[in-house]
């Protein structure tokens, strides 16, 4: 092995393989572009984005880590959202949650 060399497995890598994406239609009602990163809690995105915000509680974009989706002014597009995993605790963003999220429909209850 050469220092810094990557040894990658053959084949495709499936993102979020164990999570089912849910489609959401989103409209930018503002006058400026809005960009949302891969792990931003979608429930708490810019208020100029119009969508079923309550249904997006505990969800994030179903896109590769480190990437983003851009919504131009007046643009409507459909995005896929997946549940946060792990401890499902959300802090920061717009401060709407600041703690544990409700249990995802496809997740067992956390005990601790």
From Swiss-Prot:
A Gene Ontology cellular component where this protein is annotated is: urease complex
* Primary localisation category: cytoplasm
Q: Which UniProt keywords apply?
A: Cytoplasm, Hydrolase
According to UniProt, this protein's pathway is:
Nitrogen metabolism; urea degradation; CO(2) and NH(3) from urea (urease route): step 1/1
List where in the cell it is found: Cytoplasm
- Annotated catalysed reactions: urea + 2 H2O + H(+) = hydrogencarbonate + 2 NH4(+)
Hydrolase: is it a keyword of this entry? Answer: yes
Give the EC number(s) under which this enzyme is classified.
3.5.1.5
Tell me the protein family, please. Belongs to the urease beta subunit family.
The record describes its quaternary structure and partners as: Heterotrimer of UreA (gamma), UreB (beta) and UreC (alpha) subunits. Three heterotrimers associate to form the active enzyme.
What is the name attached to this protein's record? Urease subunit beta
Gene name, per UniProt, is ureB
């Amino acid at each position: 092995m050469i220092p810094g060399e990557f040894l990658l497995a053959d084949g495709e890598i499936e993102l979020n393989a164990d999570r089912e994406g849910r489609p959401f239609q989103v409209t930018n009602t503002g006058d400026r572009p809005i960009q949302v990163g891969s792990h931003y809690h979608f429930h708490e995105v810019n208020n100029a984005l119009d969508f079923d915000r309550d249904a997006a509680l505990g969800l994030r974009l179903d896109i590769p880590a480190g990437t983003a989706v851009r919504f131009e002014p007046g643009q409507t597009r459909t995005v896929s959202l997946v549940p946060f995993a792990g401890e499902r605790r959300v802090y920061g963003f717009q401060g709407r949650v600041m703690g544990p999220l409700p249990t995802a429909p496809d997740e067992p209850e956390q005990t601790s």
